[in-house]
Amino acid sequence: MIILKQMYVHDGRKFEALTIRNYTETDIERLISLQEECFPPPFPQELLWSEDQLASHIKTFPEGALCALINGRIIGSMTALIVQFEPDSPDHTWAQATDNGSIKNHEPHGNTLYVVDISVSPHYRKLGIGKWLMNTMYELTVDKRLERLLGGGRIPLYYKYAHEISAVQYVEDVMEGRKNDPVLSFLLRCGRSPIRVVSNYLEDKESLNYGVLMEWKNVFYKKASC
């Protein structure tokens, strides 16, 4: 177990000690409980992490397996793998990018840190936990000398407007401040930039199966010279 960050966050009344570290096999049961808390129906329950998937994350790329704790309780997690991303052929599904969530397709010599998921307990979502997890992944992107961090974001309020506007227009409306989306708005505040709306990205009724590919470019990245 490697501790990556220790700091204090404010809950509106008092400061709480936050720890961010890599998760291990002993955390698996608590991580599954966190997923159930964060993604209730109508989110497909078969997409929640299984013991085998979490064990694969730890075995395949432990540096990309993060959890956040307050008072010894896991209240957030984030998982990533390294892939080879080609901007000229950006379309893909979540299942393709993550090997159905197992991350067994992790490419140590790839160019992109790909976010598999991020989750924070609803009781702790105003403490900036998600942003600190994301910042830790940005640091990993720089440390690994990767070109970017990338991942597909849900748009869980799109279903309310799908009869009126396209998914692309919905994203534009959120960016222009005409609408607010809990996931897309959060990712934008974390410094991510949308690059493409992808259909059939993930089975997700609320998002009508759309995903928004959003990246964070590593300004320190230098392409190796021949």
Swiss-Prot record:
<keyword id="KW-0012">Acyltransferase</keyword>
<protein>
    <recommendedName>
        <fullName>Uncharacterized N-acetyltransferase YkwB</fullName>
        <ecNumber>2.3.1.-</ecNumber>
    </recommendedName>
</protein>
<dbReference type="Pfam" id="PF00583">
    <property type="entry name" value="Acetyltransf_1"/>
</dbReference>
<dbReference type="GO" id="GO:0016747">
    <property type="term" value="F:acyltransferase activity, transferring groups other than amino-acyl groups"/>
</dbReference>
<dbReference type="InterPro" id="IPR016181">
    <property type="entry name" value="Acyl_CoA_acyltransferase"/>
</dbReference>
<keyword id="KW-0808">Transferase</keyword>
<dbReference type="InterPro" id="IPR000182">
    <property type="entry name" value="GNAT_dom"/>
</dbReference>
<comment type="similarity">
    <text>Belongs to the acetyltransferase family.</text>
</comment>
<feature type="domain" description="N-acetyltransferase">
    <location>
        <begin position="18"/>
        <end position="219"/>
    </location>
</feature>
